[in-house]
Amino acid sequence: MARSVVVALLVLLSLSGLEAIQHAPKIQVYSRHPAENGKPNFLNCYVSGFHPSDIEVDLLKNGKKIEKVEHSDLSFSKDWSFYLLYYTEFTPNEKDEYACRVSHVTFPTPKTVKWDRTM
């Protein structure tokens, strides 16, 4: 019985140590298809490699939050870091600017990454 108590304590200690590890998210913003003005497309924001899992992701049009956004389920990699995909349908043009804003404990303020239509 003493052995099982020791094993249980070691497991709890190792799990509590996971919460202390923090990794900043990598943010990638891209369209599903090459951008063509006036042609419907999908804007994607792929956020990966972050820990802990608490995160807030917003897609922006001209600095304002886009309301109709969908996302994948929160998933994790082999290294226990997390990843998510946020996406929305949009129609690019010359005047509108699109971006992805991410809030995470590893950032002192939210980080915004602009969509580069040439990518």
From Swiss-Prot:
This is Beta-2-microglobulin. It is found in: Secreted. Heterodimer of an alpha chain and a beta chain. Beta-2-microglobulin is the beta-chain of major histocompatibility complex class I molecules. GO terms for cellular component: extracellular region; MHC class I protein complex. Residues 25-114 form the Ig-like C1-type domain. It comes from Lagothrix lagotricha. CDD domains: IgC1_beta2m (cd05770). It comes from the Eukaryota. Pfam families: C1-set. Belongs to the beta-2-microglobulin family.
